[in-house]
């Protein structure tokens, strides 16, 4: 799964339809798609926004739809580009807690961030500058 910094939601689709879209491409049956999409949206606190389109949601809500889309199918790896960048600190903590739980369940998380506090939550921190690894060290260990 991939969590885009810029959401990349389809404006004409509702939140639940945006989350279901990658599941369609996996060939998943409609009932299972709907169940997984609903559970993912509930997990990010958007159970009351499932029928809303992106233009009807705040930036933080759109980011949470993007996160739900990435995690709905429980992929083995999630690449997250600034996943909490558009969220308030409380919502950001909830998202990081969710990513941590996914990691405990066996999902690998690759987190791209400029936020040092967020980076410190990881088990391993690789710092890249101009395309080169300049450090590779242990973090405090969320994931």
Regions found by a protein language model. Name each.
Residues 1-128:
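ABC family nucleotide-binding domain
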Residues 124, 132-143:
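Conserved beta-strand-loop-alpha-helix hinge in the C-terminal portion
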